[in-house]
Each structure stands twice: as C-alpha cells, then as structure tokens.
Swiss-Prot record:
Glycans are attached at N74, N97, N231, N235, N254, N286, N522, N580, N637, N821. One of its GO terms (biological process) is chloride transport. This is Calcium-activated chloride channel regulator 2. Keywords: Autocatalytic cleavage, Calcium, Cell adhesion, Cell junction, Cell membrane, Chloride, Glycoprotein, Hydrolase, Ion transport, Membrane, Metal-binding, Metalloprotease, Protease, Signal, Transmembrane, Transmembrane helix, Transport, Zinc.
Length: 942
C-alpha cells in the first residue's frame, strides 16, 4: 500500500465540505461567469464552427458588448457592467495567435453565435427553461444580425438588444410584448396595445387604405391586417424588455410604470411583478451597491480564445472492486463503442489505468482510421488487479501526464474518469485538477464511489454520471455517448438513436423496430452486447429488405460485443432487429445504434437531457428537462420519457411534457420537463431520456423559441410612416418522413435526507402557473392546468380560489383575500385543463358594498388560487390573473385618442395634404360628436 500524506486530506476535505454548501452555479470555480465589485468577469461568447470565418464578427461582438456595458450600467442605476469578456473562436478559423482554451467550450457559453435554422430569421433570442427570476441557458445571435447594420432599424442598436437578452438570461425576466395577443381591452374598456410602459404612444394602421374605425374593430378585438406603429420620438423611458430600440427607452419598467394589465409573459410568469422588481431581487443587485460618482466604468476587456487539437485520456479503475457486478465487462463494452464510434476523427487519445498507483497503457495516438480505433481498443484493460485500494488521484495524475505529452500543458484537454472505489483521499487532487485547465468527466460505478468523485467534475466543468450495478442498465454506454467534443458542431457528433436492454429467457428473443431518419445515416454503427457465453443469433433487416446476420457482425468474444458499421449512408426508414438468446440461461441483451448527420444541408434532431440542480435535500423535488431540437428549432408533440435509476430499487419511468404547466414554464418551446420526487433512498440517481416521434403527430415550432428581441416593422416619424424592410423569415423546414428517435444520458444527481421506511406525505401539489381569467358578461371564467397530488402527478383534492380588487392583497396577503365558493369544483387529473365560472358581485356582500358607490365605473378583479391534496398540503399561490369588470351593457371598447387610422407610407405626402387630412378628420369628429348613437364605437389614438 502506498504511503500518503495525512495532512493534505484534512485541508482538502474542509474544502469539499465548503463546496457542498455552495450553490451548483458556484461549484464550477475553474471558469465561468462571476460578478465582483459591480463588474461581470468571464462572460463567454462562442462562435459556432459552422460560421464562415469573418474577423468583422469579432469586431462587432466587441462593439456590441461595449455599448451594452454602458447601457446596462445606466439601466441598473450604476450597479453592474461587463468587465472582461472571452470570445471563443472556432478551431476551423485561421490561427491568429489566439490564447488556448482551458475549460471553456462552446457548450458552456453564455452567448452563442450560430446560423439560424429553418424559419426563425435573425431574431436574437434567449433560451429560458426556468421560472421567474431564474437564469436561462444561453443567448443566441446570428452572424447576419451581427454583420448587417441595416437590421438595427428593426431590432435597435446591438448593445441595447444585448441588454434585453441579458435580462432574460441572467435575471429571468420575460418579454413585455405578445405577438399572439398584440391588443387587449383594459379596465377603462379601451383597446390597448400590449406594451410596457403604457405611456409609449403610436397610431393604428390599416393595410387596406384609409378606413373608418369600424373596419378595424370586430367583436371588441382588432381585425387581421390592422397593426400599430409607434412614434419614433417618445417621452417614455421604459421598458427595455418591451422595445429597447426606442431612443428614449433607458430603463426597465418599475412599480410606477409597469403595465400589469398587458397579457404578456412577464405578467403571467412573474405574477404581475415589474421587470425591475424581479431584477432588484436578484443576488446580483442585492449584493451590488451603486458605484459612486457620475462617470462610466472602463470599457470591457476582451480575450480571444481558440481550441487546439482535441486531446482525451481515459482514466480507468482496475482495482479489485471493478470485478463486482460485471463492472469491467460493462466498461469494456461502453469504452469500445466510444473509441470505435463516438470520439471524433483527428482526436488524440490516451489510456491510463489505476488501482493504488497509476499506469500509462497507451500514450497519445491520433485517430485517422478504423485501424487506429481498433488499436486503442486493444489497450483497454482485460482484467482487474488484486489490489483492493483505489487511488483516484494517482490515476488523475497519470492522466495529466498523458495529455501534457501534446504541448506540455493540460489546457483544453479532457479526462474521462471511470471508478468503482471510494477514495477518502480524493481531496488531495481537487485544487490541482481545478487549476489544471483540463475538464474531467466522471463515471461512478456503484454507490460507494458516487458521492465524492463527482467533485472533480464540478470543479472542472465536466459531466458526472452514476452507473448502477445492474447489467440491465445501459447507463454506461449512454454516458460515453453523451461526452461529445463540446465544439457545437452537431454535424460531426455521434447521435444515439437506439438504446434497448432486456433480460431474455433461453431461446426467446429481443425484437424491435427502430428508425434511421433522413437527417442521420452516415457512420452508422449497430452494437449488440451480451452477458455470458457466445453471441446471440442476430437478424437485422434494413428498409429495403436486405438482411444482416450474425456473420456480418465483427465479434469480440473477450468484450462480448458484436458490431456492424453500415458503409456509406444507412438507408433511411425503419430497421428491424431480432436477437435470439441461444444460451441456456437468461441474460441481458443490449442493442445500441449510433449515427452521424447525413448531410450538411439538414440539421439532425438532437436531445439534451439535464436536471435543474445536481443535488437536493428531501423533500425538495428535482426538475428533469429535455431539450429537443432540430438544429436550433424546437420540436413539438414528441413523446419524451425519462428513466431514473436509484442506487437501490427499481427504475422510475416518467413522461416529460411541454405544456407550459407544472415544471414546464413556456408551452411549445421544445423543452420538456417534469417534477421528480419518487425518492427511494438517499444517494445517487442516474437519468436517461428517450425521445420518439411519429411524423403524423410531431411538428416544428413556428415562432422563435424562448424570449427574443422584437423586430419593429416601422415607426411614425414627423407624422410620416417609415417602414422597415420586411423581416427575414428564413426557409420552411423539410418535414421528416419517418419520424425519429434519440437517446441521451442526463448525468446523475444526488438526494440527501430521504427517510428510511414509510414516512408521511411531504409533497404538495405544484404551483399553478397558467391561470387565465376572462370576462363573459357579468361573470369571470377561470381556466388553468390541473396540478397533481404530488407536484404534477396524480390528482389533487380541492382548490382554494380567492379574489380582490387590490393586487397587494392577493399577492402579499392571499389568506385574507375574498374567498370564492368552489366547493362544487371537482379537481381533474394532473395535466387536464380546468375551467370555473363565478360572478364577482355575488361572491360576498363585502364586495357588493365595496362596489355600491361606483357600480357603473370599471374596476379590476385580481384572482389567484392554490391546490390542496388529501394530506392537506397546499401548493404555492398561483400566478395572478386579472379581468376588467363593470360598465353598462352593450358598451364597446374604444381606442384611447382621436379617431384616425393611417395607411401606407406617407413620406411623399406634402404638408398641404397632411393639413387637409387633419381638417377632414376634425370635421368627421365634430359631426360624430353630434350623433350619440355612434359614440360608443369611438376610435382614438394611443
């Protein structure tokens, strides 16, 4: 047994204890975004490798963020700005002596620059998957947006757009406009434009020429073809989350300027709170006092980074514990797939093994051909040692030696650490690993290793996986496939399209059909693995009817694998496979299929699975997410199923949803989610997600995913209409003929504090986030998605609905708001749409008395509710909905200024024509005022 320093672990373990108390966002100390002394450090902007080289992009990115820094500083009342920024240049671009990356990569970037896919055009957008006040995934800009100065007319200055998107990303606020509901009727029975603040002015425009207001208003809403153009000169200073393109807009809507009646995402998701209220509640502004003085901060500094050759080292545990539970065999099978299929060509790969000491089995070798891949497979360990000790740090140290062979440094390299042993001395190499510049992905085999080895991944920005000791689990294979290059080039990545594992009785079969869709097919590999004896009888039938048998597969008896690589491009369509267990006892048979994109002209569908946080304490639930996309385009109506495997107990299968309710924030954004609370034991849990869809049910979303910058069609300038160029909508996507399937590991998470044995119910219904209210005559009709008995699963017992004329009362003192009798409302199963109708004036005498003096005056009713389960556990109070009430019957909504609807471009109209038009309109208004019968349909400017 090797001697170890006894003082190092004490210090290291204290560090580990400290790290456990920090939030997941702070655990990645080796890189990442930080706020220090009012300045953001480490903002990472990454350019996709498919973007053609253009140094003007770098120049414009610098100018955009510099402008954004000053704009942000003033908008936040001198609280935050950008101090230093890293720009990750693709490895495909010419090397201009850029600095080398350390742990930075495209898939960790805060901002990405990539070609827009399908019909999104050039809209900048932020991918938001969490709720109000919580961070998003990334900001996306297209090269065209950054290079084409003419787009500034529609979107506004790039720096202002960046701040709009930054508020989405960093502070979790939402758009204050709504393309689906551009108009609404306010509490004064006026038709208003959805905006914030309501002080922003403009005029209604009809596409069919000068027309009376009646032609633009039908049944209290605007006819298609009517639009609203804003005045280019405004007095309103807000809001950045509505229209930062207006020169006067320099701040976020606050408590005094917020338009809580507007039907936008900000009001829905944040319960009518202003964007500034949400932003000031963030940790950024809570811990940042305004900078003294009147001057601006220094401009940001920029560092240009570029990845070099990709360097990977497998660091494999061969201690005695690897003999348990077929761990070594499962490792061999998964590592063979990684080396033969997943790792990309031209990568340098080395292999290290360790028990109580480390050993280099293969120095770095670059992959050019399948022969190079087979040679690396031959270096995989074939037996475990007799040494019971596991010295993870010894293996990691040898791994660093291997990756440093390339250029003397570990910067930008990747270590894939696979271990089954608990090592109390792992803290000895935490700081070394964190400062190495290498990213460490860890796979913990069995429960004893899982709790500590993940720290190496957290500190270096790597992925961590927990692999249960079950041969029926395909988790290790899925983990290896998940570890991609991180470059963002999905056309080079291997995608897992099938993963099936079943225990098959003797002389019985595992048979199924899988799909090779039209976007994949290159470099397609079928891998069959078994548990004991010789290979099963294999029959594989392609869409044209060609049959492949066992003899067509390459058999590795030592690793118990059979692989078949389809030459060229695999035929698109349905493939059928049959595995017959010829062994005399039951055994687990597995089928894995991986493939690459078939063409650069068509983005393949991708699946990214992840959890909100990688550790939680009982009874806090875990939120599981699956980001399903075709390029950058959301895929809707797919069947998305998560499988969660605990250390002990049976797997839990859960369907993820994209309905905008429960754990899901935005409907139809391609991010499917669900609460998970079926905790069997304290410990680690492994996550895998499968996606399948039929072309008859799945569609591609038409709007831009997430929250995006508004493209303004035109403005009113000096009483003239100035239209911008039509927005670029791109091209329509090609419809998939066969549907598709994908599989992805979501890594692992840990749960602490789960009680032993039976315990009382501690899981309430989830918060209702999509409550809507609508006035129908004198009644209010409510609708929402039903929560469950436990979060978003099962069936809740009852609802508590309350209303008030005071927003403060309903939001801050819900228990004392007026109770609505909902005793006859029987809750439905989670996910079902609920409706409930009530009359506010009949709820209580208290409200009747409150309204007695101004019964004919318009007023707003605020409504919220919460659910209760059979254990009397209550959900959080829902989002707040409002509805405008009262006014005499038959009154029609009006537009709030003088009666005029403009059409076309008036820049060629002379001053005389304008004066004549004004006189005609004034004459019409004068005449209409004499006709009371038409007063109710009066149309006005906003």
């Amino acid at each position: 047994m090797t001697h170890r320093d006894s003082t190092g672990p004490v210090i290291g373990l204290k560090l580990v204890t400290l790290l456990f108390t920090l939030s997941p966002e702070l655990l990645f100390l080796g890189a990442g975004l930080k706020l220090k002394e009012n300045g953001y450090d480490g903002l990472l902007v990454a350019i996709n490798p498919r973007v053609p080289e253009d140094l003007k992009l770098i120049t414009n990115i610098k100018e955009m963020i510099t402008e954004a820094s000053f704009y942000l500083f003033n908008a936040t009342k001198r609280r935050v700005f950008f101090r230093n920024v890293q720009i990750l240049v693709p490895a495909t671009w010419t090397d201009h002596n850029y600095s080398r990356v350390r742990q930075e990569s495209y898939d960790k970037a805060n901002v990405i620059v990539a070609e827009q896919s399908e019909e999104h055009g050039d809209d900048p957008y932020t991918l938001q998957h969490r709720g109000c006040g919580q961070e998003g995934r990334y900001i996306h800009f297209t090269p065209s947006f950054l290079l084409n100065d003419e787009l500034a007319a529609g979107y506004g200055a790039r720096g202002r757009v960046f701040v709009h998107e930054w508020a989405h990303l960093r502070w979790g606020v939402f758009d204050e406009y709504n393309n689906d509901k551009p108009f609404y009727v306010n509490g004064r029975n006026e038709i208003q434009v959805t905006r914030c603040s309501s002080d922003i002015t403009g005029v209604f425009v009809c596409e069919k020429g000068l027309c009376p207001h009646e032609d633009c208003i039908i049944s209290k809403i605007f006819r298609e073809g009517c639009t609203f153009l804003y005045n280019s000169t405004q007095n309103a200073t807000g809001s950045i989350m509505f229209m930062p393109s207006l020169p006067s807009v320099v701040e976020f809507c606050n408590e005094s300027t917020h338009n809580q009646e507007a039907p936008n995402l900000q009001n829905q998701v944040c319960s009518l709170r202003s964007t500034w209220d949400v932003i000031t509640a963030s940790s950024d502004l809570n811990h940042s006092l305004p900078v003294h003085g009147v001057g601006l901060p220094a401009p940001p500094t920029f560092s240009l980074l570029q990845a070099g050759d990709r360097v990977v080292c497998l660091v494999i545990d061969v201690s005695r514990k690897m003999a348990e539970g077929d761990r070594l065999l499962r490792l061999q099978q998964a590592a063979e797939l990684y080396l033969m299929q997943v790792v990309e060509a031209h990568t340098f790969v080395g292999i290290v093994t360790f028990d109580s000491k480390g050993e280099i089995r293969a120095s770095l070798q670059q992959i050019y051909s399948d022969d190079d891949r087979k040679l690396l497979v031959s270096y995989l360990p074939t037996a475990v040692s007799t040494d019971a000790e596991t010295n993870i740090c010894a293996g990691v140290k040898k791994g660093f030696e291997v990756v440093e062979e390339r250029n003397g440094r570990a910067d930008g390299s990747v270590l894939i650490l696979v271990t089954s042993g608990a090592d109390e001395h792992i803290a000895n190499c935490l700081l070394t690993s964190m400062n190495s510049g290498s990213t460490i992905h860890s796979m913990a085999l069995g429960s004893s290793a899982a709790r500590k080895v993940g720290e190496l991944s957290r500190l270096t920005g790597g992925l961590k996986f927990f692999i249960p000791d079950k041969f029926t689990s395909n988790g290790m294979t899925e983990a290896f496939v998940r570890i991609s290059s991180g470059t963002g080039d999905i056309f080079q990545q291997s995608l897992q399209v099938e993963s099936v594992c079943e225990t098959v009785q003797p002389q019985h079969q595992l048979a199924d059909t899988m799909t090779v869709d039209s976007a994949v097919g290159n470099d397609t590999l079928f891998l069959v693995t078994w548990q004991t004896g010789g290979p099963p009888e294999i029959a594989l039938l392609d869409p044209s009817g060609r049959k492949y048998n066992t003899g067509d597969f390459i058999i590795n008896l030592a690793f118990r694998t059979a692989s078949l690589k389809i030459p060229g491009t695999a035929k698109h369509g349905h493939w059928t496979y049959t595995l017959n267990n010829t062994h005399h006892s039951p055994q687990a048979l597995k089928v894995t299929v991986a493939s690459r994109a078939s063409s650069l002209a068509m983005s393949p569908a991708t699946l990214e699975a992840f959890v909100e946080r990688d550790s939680t304490y009982f009874p806090q639930p875990v939120i599981i997410y699956a980001n399903v996309r075709k390029g950058l385009h959301p895929i809707l109506n797919a069947t998305v199923v998560a499988t969660v495997e605990p250390e002990a107990g049976d797997p839990v299968v859960l369907q993820l949803l994209d309905g905008g309710a429960g754990a899901d924030v935005i409907r139809n954004d391609g991010i499917y989610s669900r609460y998970f609370s079926s905790f069997a034991v304290s410990g680690s849990y492994s996550l895998t997600v499968h996606v399948r869809h039929s072309p008859s049910t799945s569609t591609l979303a038409l709007p831009v995913p997430g929250n995006h910058a508004m493209y303004v069609p035109g403005y009113i300038t000096n009483d003239n209409i100035q239209m911008n160029a039509p927005k670029n909508l791109g091209h329509r996507p090609v419809k998939e003929r066969w549907g598709f399937s994908r599989v992805s590991s979501g890594g692992s998470f840990s749960v602490l504090g789960v009680p032993d044995g039976p315990h009382p119910d501690m899981f309430p219904p989830c918060k209702i986030t999509d409550l809507e209210a609508m006035k129908v005559e004198d009644d209010v009709v409510l609708s929402w998605t039903a929560p469950g008995e436990d979060f978003d699963q099962g069936q809740t017992t009852s609802y508590e609905i309350r209303m008030s004329r005071s927003l403060w009362n309903i939001r801050d003192d819900f228990d004392n708001a007026i109770l609505v009798n909902s005793s006859e409302l029987v809750p439905q199963h989670a996910g079902t749409r609920e409706t409930f109708t009530f009359s506010p004036k009949l709820v209580t005498h208290e409200l009747d008395h409150e309204l007695a003096e101004d019964a004919q005056e318009p007023y707003i009713v605020y409504v919220a509710l919460r659910a209760m389960d059979r254990s009397s556990l209550r959900s959080a109070v829902s989002n707040i909905a409002l509805v405008s009430m009262s006014l005499p019957p038959n009154s029609s909504p009006v537009v709030s200024r003088d009666d005029l609807i403009l059409k076309g471009v008036l820049t060629t109209v002379g001053l005389i024509a304008i004066l004549c038009l004004i006189m005609v309109v004034a004459h019409c208004i004068f005449n209409r005022k004499k006709r009371p019968s038409r007063k109710e349909n009066e149309t006005k400017f906003l």
